[in-house]
């Protein structure tokens, strides 16, 4: 062994002794690790994410216009974590959490940790404490725009506080990103949309809270309503598009189309029916849908209702859809990048 190699080995041993095992390794060793994921609660979104769900130990940003379904998407993830026996927390900075609606989406409100902070600093400190405990599987912050700095709350109306919130988010994410990665917590930040003044060319839309969240996010999802869903003359929900704008663990720019039904959330039957029809697992002839020569119903809404009443058949079709896309129940791909990387 050369003197250079011996010196390097000694340095590596010293680093591991001081900072712990795994604090430094060769990239090839890192690549052998697989990404652990938790389902988003939507089959279409799991497929669009490319790894079968939200990657653990990462920052996720979900943004979009008002009433587009951002909180609904997040609550489905919480319900899925709880279904698997995990612990979830919700930082309600907007003070708008509806426990009745959350319960309808499958959230166990008796077990959900809820905080309604007075200031942005308080909300982020609570989030940090929960993440560092290592006992929380998912934490949702709703929303970044509502994380108002203490100086702004205590100041007078009309006072200028330029860049305060951006600095707050930048500092918080610098502290949080490493802890999130080590604890394997999924941190979902819900964000709103603002319009930049005076933009003549390009997209005038931006998200509040500065650039830090864009950099630290492993996945960024844009949620937008596409069209209204009607049953007869009644509007019963919205067809919603969820676009994966950024993805560090799989190819980005995939789009998931889901039905968000009023009072019910994401329609599992609707997304399974659409995806199975595209793959010809479910056959469509005129208005009729059929599976293995068994008719599911005439029209999309009737077929959805049939699958809702026949859960075994629904899950059988879902299994074939998952199998085709290669995501399985416990999917994962090779993890080749550090979540704290900002490029």
UniProtKB/Swiss-Prot annotation:
This chain belongs to the protein called Protein RecA
- Broad class of where this protein is predominantly found: cytoplasm
Instruction: Report the PROSITE patterns cross-referenced here.
Output: RECA_1, RECA_2, RECA_3
Domain of life per record: Bacteria
Task of the protein: Can catalyze the hydrolysis of ATP in the presence of single-stranded DNA, the ATP-dependent uptake of single-stranded DNA by duplex DNA, and the ATP-dependent hybridization of homologous single-stranded DNAs. It interacts with LexA causing its activation and leading to its autocatalytic cleavage.
The record, for InterPro entries, names: AAA+_ATPase (IPR003593), DNA_recomb/repair_RecA (IPR013765), DNA_recomb/repair_RecA_CS (IPR020584), P-loop_NTPase (IPR027417), RecA-like_C (IPR049261), RecA-like_N (IPR049428), RecA_ATP-bd (IPR020588), RecA_C_sf (IPR023400)
A cellular component term (GO) from this record? cytosol
One Gene Ontology term of the molecular function aspect: ATP binding
Q: Does the keyword DNA repair apply?
A: yes
| Gene Ontology biological process terms, A to Z | DNA recombination; DNA repair; SOS response
For this UniProt record, the keywords arranged alphabetically read as follows:
ATP-binding, Cytoplasm, DNA damage, DNA recombination, DNA repair, DNA-binding, Nucleotide-binding, SOS response
Q: Tell me the PANTHER family matching this sequence.
A: MITOCHONDRIAL DNA REPAIR PROTEIN RECA HOMOLOG-RELATED, RECA
**Record has DNA-binding as a keyword:** yes
The entry's localization annotation reads: Cytoplasm
* Homology family: Belongs to the RecA family.
The stretch of residues making up the signal peptide is none
The record's Pfam families line, in alphabetical order, gives: RecA, RecA_C
Binding positions (ATP): 64-71
